[in-house]
């Protein structure tokens, strides 16, 4: 008497299902090629790290709160720096319970859902763009200037943002009303400060080719030595072993120093690099695979980003470059002039990048690079996308660095007003320019065809309030 | 006779035991509850700390440095203007910090005449409470309300103009709906909520 057919089928089902289930579970927990787990196209902000699932899904059993905490883990500092206009604490207050019932703004994922390509709009927003209406229905009665405006127009360029309104609040608009398009002084922020800092780290006697301390087996050729000797590193007393050896194993020669070597001295630059799209795969806590049982899974990090994987137009011959510090800063010739514009154009192939080389900004950049104009008057890609950032320590001391997170002030683009545009241009000119997609594509060659009215509205309201107050009427 | 006495005695003992059960339960198993501070005392204590800190900041920092010594101003946009945060902002920042660390209570500073419209009363109890403390000098308002399906003990305390800085700022602010405040006037109220279920 053989085994009944039904039992046979059950055993077969179990024999197939259990191992397959264990494999899937192991991949979910430890890593490997997880692309089959993706439930929908990932947003442009996260697609590079989509296979490091536990960057966001920090717990297998987590819900909205877990995802929210993951968002805050990476974006919290940025929101705090932006004086987030809608912090979570505003919505955990019981007095707003009725609002939360309509739109639960306590969690990031209410507005920013991942893997939902069909409903994902700019900046990863997955709600319809009339979301402001849920809480601000009275705006037309409070602000007559807003009567008749479409509910989808609140976040139009130059008006309001949900999180960052540092360049758009009423007093700011009023303070900068009436500014000329071209300010009298047109220099990037902190230009002098950065120059003084650069000089401060120069040593009394810069190193030369004869000082190179690389072991004979690794001595570079004359061209490498010449590059290094003419470079800021030699000027600051950084010898070959400064980058090619590590503290843990000082005897071991590191043939190609990576981001860890750079981090030893350029911590802020490396940190911000890993916060932006160029280097986010290199964040220290991101893992493609974690150590698994029985040696089945070996810990590995994500591979460096390549232009081929980008969602913006890139040059075909740069498709397989990998993005690390050395991509823009060559190893021994730390040429910041090259890194600030030509390095970008080495990969990026979109209209905005291509138009830069025919723009007034590039003309200024060339003049500065040629020594024909003062430091800080040229405008490179990095001037706008990697601006100098000032840091104040708790003791009041100042320091500055060039942020290497090129996304920090990119969207919504009004974020660029304070950190970049306002150094050279009046607020109205800047808001109008940033509101014109065609002008942006032309890299600001020409004038904006869009006019943002927010400054005029703020001015009108200021006058009306002053008049009413002068007449003794209630506001 | 003796049988009846025994029956009565037994019944009395039984009743006494039944009556003692809740007391004993509270004593042995619910000691924490029995000794719990009444929620009204809790909100009163919280408010005492809030009101003291608020008065100290307003009088000894803002009024002294801005109005008396004129060495620095207090401004809504204190970051941009390198100024002191307004007393109301200091209070709100504290409330936001508390909200980040606990849900056991929450508080806010509201007014029937708010400079920022977001700080006008929203719930029926906020409206009733603010009106009560404005019209009944020295008295607090207590009540219970249900918000988002949760019950809250809600206390409202008068927020009084403790220094000339309060009066001059509110009377002079372009967004202030009232411009005739005087020192010691009730300008609004502190609303403290404690969830009760």
Locate each region found by the language model.
Chain B
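Extracytoplasmic c-type cytochrome modules immediately beyond a signal peptide or single-pass transmembrane anchor
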Residues: 24-161, 175-197
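The canonical Cys-X-X-Cys-His
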Residues: 162-174
């Amino acid at each position: 008497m053989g085994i009944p057919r039904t039992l046979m089928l059950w055993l077969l089902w179990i024999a197939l299902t259990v191992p397959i289930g264990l494999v899937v579970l192991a991949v979910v927990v430890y890593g490997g090629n997880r692309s089959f787990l993706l439930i929908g196209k990932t947003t442009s902000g996260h697609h590079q790290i989509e296979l490091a699932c536990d960057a966001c899904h920090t717990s297998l059993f987590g819900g909205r709160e877990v995802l929210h905490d993951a968002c805050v883990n990476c974006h919290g500092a940025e929101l705090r720096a932006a004086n987030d206009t809608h912090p979570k604490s505003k919505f955990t207050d019981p007095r707003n319970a009725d609002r939360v019932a309509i739109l639960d703004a306590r969690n990031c994922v209410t507005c920013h859902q991942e893997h939902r390509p069909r409903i994902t709009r700019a900046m990863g927003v997955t709600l319809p763009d009339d979301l402001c209406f849920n809480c601000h229905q009275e705006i037309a009665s409070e602000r007559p200037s807003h009567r008749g405006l479409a509910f989808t127009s609140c976040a139009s360029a130059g008006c309001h943002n949900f999180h960052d309104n540092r360049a758009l609040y009423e007093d700011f608009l009023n303070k900068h009303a009436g500014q000329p398009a071209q300010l009298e002084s047109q220099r990037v922020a902190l230009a002098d400060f950065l120059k003084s800092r650069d000089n401060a780290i120069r040593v009394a006697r810069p190193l030369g080719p004869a000082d190179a301390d690389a072991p004979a087996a690794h001595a570079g050729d004359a061209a490498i030595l010449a590059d290094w000797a003419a470079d800021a590193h030699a000027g600051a007393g950084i010898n070959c072993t400064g980058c090619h050896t590590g503290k843990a194993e000082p005897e071991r020669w590191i043939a190609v120093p990576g981001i860890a070597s750079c981090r030893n001295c350029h911590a802020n630059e490396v940190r911000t690099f890993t916060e932006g799209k160029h280097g986010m795969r290199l964040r220290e806590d991101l893992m493609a695979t974690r150590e698994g049982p029985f040696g089945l899974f070996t810990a590995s990090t994500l591979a460096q980003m390549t232009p081929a994987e980008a969602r913006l137009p890139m040059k075909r011959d740069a498709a397989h470059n990998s993005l690390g510090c050395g991509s823009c800063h060559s190893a021994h010739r730390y040429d910041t002039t090259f890194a600030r514009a030509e390095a970008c154009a080495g990969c990026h192939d979109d209209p905005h990048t291509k138009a830069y080389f025919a723009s007034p900004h590039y003309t200024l950049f060339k003049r500065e690079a040629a020594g024909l104009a003062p430091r800080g008057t040229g405008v490179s890609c990095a001037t706008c996308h990697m601006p100098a950032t000032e840091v104040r320590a708790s003791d009041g001391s100042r320091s500055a660095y060039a942020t290497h997170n090129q996304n920090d002030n990119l969207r919504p683009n009004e974020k660029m007003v304070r950190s970049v545009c306002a150094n050279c241009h009046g607020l109205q000119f800047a808001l109008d320019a940033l509101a014109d997609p065609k002008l942006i594509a032309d890299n600001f060659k020409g004038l904006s065809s869009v006019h943002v009215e927010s400054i005029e509205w703020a001015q009108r309201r200021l006058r009306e309030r002053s008049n009413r107050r002068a007449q003794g009427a209630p506001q | 006779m003796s049988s009846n006495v025994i029956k009565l005695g037994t019944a009395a003992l039984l009743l006494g035991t039944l009556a003692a059960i809740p007391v004993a339960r509270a004593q042995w198993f619910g000691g924490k509850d029995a000794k719990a501070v009444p929620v009204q005392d809790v909100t009163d204590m919280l408010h005492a700390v809030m009101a003291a800190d608020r008065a100290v900041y307003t009088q000894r920092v803002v009024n002294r440095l801005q109005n008396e010594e004129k060495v620095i101003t207090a401004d809504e946009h204190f970051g941009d203007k390198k100024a002191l945060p307004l007393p109301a902002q200091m209070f709100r920042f504290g409330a936001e910090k508390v909200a980040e660390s606990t849900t056991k209570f929450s508080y806010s500073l509201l007014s029937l005449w708010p400079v920022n419209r977001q700080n006008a009363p929203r719930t029926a109890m906020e409206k009733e409470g603010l009106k009560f403390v404005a019209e009944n000098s020295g008295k607090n308002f207590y009540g219970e309300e249900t918000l988002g399906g949760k019950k809250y003990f809600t206390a409202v305390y008068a927020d009084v103009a403790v220094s000339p800085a309060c009066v001059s700022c509110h009377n002079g602010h372009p967004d202030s709906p009232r411009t005739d405040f005087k020192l010691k006037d009730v300008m609004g109220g502190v609303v403290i909520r404690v969830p009760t279920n």
